[in-house]
Amino acid sequence: MARTDEIIARTAPGHLNDHNLIDREVESLCDGMVKYEKRPAKRHDGSVAEGIYNAWIILDNPKQYNSYTTDMVKAIILAFRRASVDRSVNAVVFTGVGDKAFCTGGNTKEYAEYYAGNPQEYRQYMRLFNDMVSAILGCDKAVISRVNGMRIGGGQEIGMACDFSIAQDLANFGQAGPKHGSAAIGGATDFLPLMVGCEQAMVSGTLCEPFSAHKAARLGIICDVVPALKVGGKFVANPTVVTDRYLDEYGRVVHGEFKAGAAFKEGQGQIKEGEIDLSLLDEKVESLCTKLLETFPECMTKSLEELRKPKLHAWNLNKENSRAWLALNMMNEARTGFRAFNEGTKETGREIDFVKLRQGLAKGTPWTEELIESLMPTAQK
């Protein structure tokens, strides 16, 4: 009987059709701020599976915490499309440069300086954003979110669109919408109720309070978490988070919650004194890629398609009217919130005076440029 590699050499077609939409390098669309790399896939024994790769899609905007610009969104769409149709790709690893941020969502500078007050432009931007989320959900390969740092706002939304998430435990998660002039309707309001239940989804989507990677694992938002902090040459759990017990004296779950007061500050000091090492994160990601490799490819794709259906159903049901609302919201609250974040500083803060705004609206005060200017953090000081 002929060997498998002999059969492949004899029967594989001499020409393969190209199913990419456009023939462009991903990096060329955004000055290299999204990188596309094919890294050799490995078997369980560590040997390279010749001709098979894992596609790494890497956000490279660390100065702005890997937030995505319009051009980066275009590149991400192209990258996922490329990985999806590449016959040699086993799995996709979606991540960011550095150890501070996976992604913090849309680029607030661009939002504040270009899209604020321009709903017709933001509506077109949201077409691209929607296509980005759909590209992740529609990828023919398993998608792993390698959470190298904080995953906030739109970053949390594109992260939850992935099939698996593995985080280093210094990473924080959460939404930012109502605190900064928006609503988390770019995927979070679709995915969170499915993943964590209605009450916890409500907490995350409205209060905008960040939570730890350990809590994300407990809630079911990520599938695994690994330490990244080394103190004295040894890995230790995030010292700002409760990880040594599950319940408090009243029976309430405290595992994964942030410590308070002096204990939290002490933990912050330990982080500053230690070193960040993402080697365990990379080992976990590589291990998962190998597990995915050792499966039938079409059965894997079908399993992904079926298991994604709850997310896809909610997403497709809401994405178009969400796009319309987000565009119109750029005339008032988003216009105000994004400007406040962009123009504010550490000294002035990056949020408006919410009580003053509510007091004004309660008296029927119209949205005017004068009102918006008066609410800016710099005006309050």
Swiss-Prot record:
Entry keyword annotation includes Hydrolase: yes
Enzyme Commission number: 3.7.1.21
Catalytic activity: 6-oxocyclohex-1-ene-1-carbonyl-CoA + 2 H2O = 3-hydroxy-6-carboxyhexanoyl-CoA + H(+)
A Gene Ontology molecular function term of the record: 6-hydroxycyclohex-1-ene-1-carboxyl-CoA hydratase activity
Key words, A-Z: Hydrolase
Entry similarity comment: Belongs to the enoyl-CoA hydratase/isomerase family.
GO BP: benzoyl-CoA catabolic process; fatty acid beta-oxidation
Complex and partners: Homohexamer.
Designated gene of the protein: bamA
Entry's induction text: By benzoate.
Pathway involvement of the protein, from the record: Aromatic compound metabolism; benzoyl-CoA degradation
Stored SUPFAM superfamilies: ClpP/crotonase (SSF52096)
Taxonomy, superkingdom: Bacteria
NAD found in the keyword field: no
Function statement: Involved in the central benzoyl-CoA catabolism. Catalyzes the addition of one molecule of water to the double bond and the hydrolytic cleavage of C-C bond in the alicyclic ring, 6-oxocyclohex-1-ene-1-carbonyl-CoA (6-OCH-CoA) to yield 3-hydroxypimelyl-CoA.
The protein's name: 6-oxocyclohex-1-ene-1-carbonyl-CoA hydrolase
Lineage: Bacteria, Pseudomonadati, Thermodesulfobacteriota, Desulfuromonadia, Geobacterales
NCBIfam families: dearomat_oah (TIGR03200)
Pfam families: ECH_1 (PF00378)
